[in-house]
Curated annotation (Swiss-Prot):
This is Dihydrolipoyl dehydrogenase. It comes from Trypanosoma cruzi. The active site is a redox-active disulfide bond. It catalyses: N(6)-[(R)-dihydrolipoyl]-L-lysyl-[protein] + NAD(+) = N(6)-[(R)-lipoyl]-L-lysyl-[protein] + NADH + H(+). Belongs to the class-I pyridine nucleotide-disulfide oxidoreductase family.
Amino acid sequence: MFRRCAVKLNPYDVVVIGGGPGGYVASIKAAQLGMKTACVEKRGALGGTCLNVGCIPSKALLHATHVYHDAHANFARYGLMGGEGVTMDSAKMQQQKERAVKGLTGGVEYLFKKNKVTYYKGEGSFETAHSIRVNGLDGKQEMFETKKTIIATGSEPTELPFLPFDEKVVLSSTGALALPRVPKTMVVIGGGVIGLELGSVWARLGAKVTVVEFAPRCAPTLDEDVTNALVGALAKNEKMKFMTSTKVVGGTNNGDSVSLEVEGKNGKRETVTCEALLVSVGRRPFTGGLGLDKINVAKNERGFVKIGDHFETSIPDVYAIGDVVDKGPMLAHKAEDEGVACAEILAGKPGHVNYGVIPAVIYTMPEVASVGKSEEELKKEGVAYKVGKFPFNANSRAKAVSTEDGFVKVLVDKATDRILGVHIVCTTAGELIGEACLAMEYGASSEDVGRTCHAHPTMSEALKEACMALVAKTINF
């Protein structure tokens, strides 16, 4: 039973519902721009899926398991003997992951205090377009007025109707991050970012991992050259198995295992059994309990909140950003950019997000990073383009540290030389893609990048060389 609802009559300028990457950034920026701001988050910890059960914990496990796998597979060739004897303590690995998460969530809460953002721990919902009710985690209930509201409630994993998550053997990404032991066998349904990253984590630790993907290839939104290189590396280095053009038609949770019925493109069916099943078939917008129907906020047929060019919803003074909206990829950094831009717009300033220059990264080994158009997209759109490529086996730094897998691929407009897309496969692709984003944001040509001095020896020289290939010839290949 809740206590009587306390109503605060002094309205906030902005209330943000959701404290994930989009929500907490919007809250801080709004406060920095002089608006009285509150943020409502029901998780009890700021940072959303990304910080608590997504981007950050997965990167902690990816790093730890890479070091472990590298010790067993590669230390000897570096002249470091005994790597095969390195053992893994799963509990300590999980503890390190949790330390990273705790430190960062605490850091965001500190930033709220520093910027004078009022933080409500509880579930927020609309009473009216200008009244927000909070059911607090402490059992208290409050209601307050707001001039404007930003919906930033993010998304949640999509489950299979015949195999609901139990987070023991049928896992969402959350469960796959917290397994207490290494399963002997794991099947991953969905060969996208989450499936490939988390499948890789457990493959490195000894699980036999099979990825089942409905599309003809994994990560189908990425450039095909990139996908082929990544899948080849994962199959070779981590012994992952891939079943593409394959659909899941049924399955049974046996309590300690899962029996999965799959059908290939030839119509042949087979049963695959595994100790752990990771379901990563996408995410859906989280709007439950928000009261959007009460105030008639429009959503599309998939449940995403419809927004206009300035993040406005169908209801005046109600805005939305991040995974919950019907625009752009479902990525944390996209939500952050929207958070800044939306807050700026509410403060009467120009705010803008360039949806054509939002990078995507898969943090496997090697990593994959892309920004802009793929070659397949340019062909489909009928754009005349040129391709410049440079392999890392011709890069001095990659040679020196024995990380020669991969390449840089640059796509430019054939007439103007303007960069249209950059695709990278290498151990540090996620770090290198930033330069490509900056170049594209400012409308650079491949000649601009190719004639820019890069430090030697660095992996970044491969981007310079790929650009040089488009305007003259590469020097080192």
